[in-house]
Structure formats: structure tokens, C-alpha cells
Amino acid sequence: MDDDGMGSVQVQWQISSDGNAWMNLTGAVQQSFTPRETHVGQQLRVQISYVDGQGNLETLVSPASTPVENVNDKPTGAPRLTGEAREEGALVVDTSLIADEDGVGTYSVIWQRSSTKTDWQAYPNAVGEVLQLTQSHVGYSYRAVVSYTDRHGTKEMLLTSPSETVANVDDPVEGEVMLTGDAAEGSTLVANTARVSDEDGIASLTIGWESSEDGRNWRAIETSGAS
């Protein structure tokens, strides 16, 4: 209240990190002001100016506020998986779309897997942003759990969408079939398959015998068996 009258009131909000040196907040010229992340930990006050009926410039300053307290801001955006879900491929976590007004710390990535895309289990065999896919991953879908601690000490956690089910790639047969026994009339030859392996697994094994007179041209022997 001013007995000399009050003209148009000008409002200016100010900010200080120590309560002594004050700076005007650009654009903060309304009677209400909403603090944001950039103001956390600093004090605010408002300065009111007007010209009274006698032409005098009058200025009033409010007491300083207490330091602005942080309110956790939830992250926006989400991590996503890139790469091809197939054996011998790789799934890579892309975190470029994650943003947090409170700041983003160092990412920690763990993996989960599921054969149904509903019942997820921790997959402790892999950590980090890249999952190299091998035969052991075939038939499962994977997702990544991305976590970090923001600038104010709040731990945030985000999930990627599930990958497609990892597809199998045919793995070549390894090893060789060994023949034991004497190659003589009346003797028995045995096909030893103990050294044969296949990363895809061996569901069944069929043995067929062939004969050749010159080692180049082969024909099937009608009576075949394991020996």
C-alpha cells in the first residue's frame, strides 16, 4: 500500500546460489514462478517495482526463499534393441533416445530371456550393451534392463521391447566317420561315429554303405547297417 498511489507494477524474479549475489531470471516477470531443474539448490526472491503518484520509482524485494528442492523427474524416451535375432548375429542396446532432466549417469545393462516373451528370467551370462548370439541363444527372446543413477542419486530403470525369437543357423557337421576292422572278404567293417558332432545336435543317425572299384565312382550297397 502506498499513500502516494501505485502505478503499473513490474515484477522480476531473481536467483542466487549464495544468498548474496542475485541475478535476474530472464523472462520471469509474472507474479507466479515455477522452479525447474536448473534452479535446484538455489534461492529465489521477487523484486516489485512501480512509479508512485508523485513520480518516484519504488522498489520492494521479498525475503529469499529456502533453496529449491529437487523433485525426481522421470526419464523420457526408452532404450531399444538393434541387430538381427539370429545365431551368429548380435543384439545391441541403443540408449541414444533416453533423456532425464535430472541428468543421466553411467548406464548399466543386464539381460533377460524368455521362451514365451512373458515369463522373463535373468540371463547372467551376458552383461554390457552387446549380446553376441550363439547356438545356446536359439529359441529364446531377449530384452535388456538399462539402469543408471541420476545427478540427484535416484536410480532409474528402463526396459527394451523384446527381441524376436533368436533363429537357428545351420551349423556344419564336424569330425569324421572312422572305419575299423579289416577290408577283407569275410571280415567286418564298423563305422565309428564317435568323432562326429553337430552344434545343432544330432537327432538321428543313418548309415549307408557304398562301394567303388576305382575310389572315384561310388554306388550304394543294398544291404546296409551300422557295420
Sequence positions of predicted segments:
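Ser/Thr/Pro/Gly-rich low-complexity disordered regions
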Residues: M1-S227
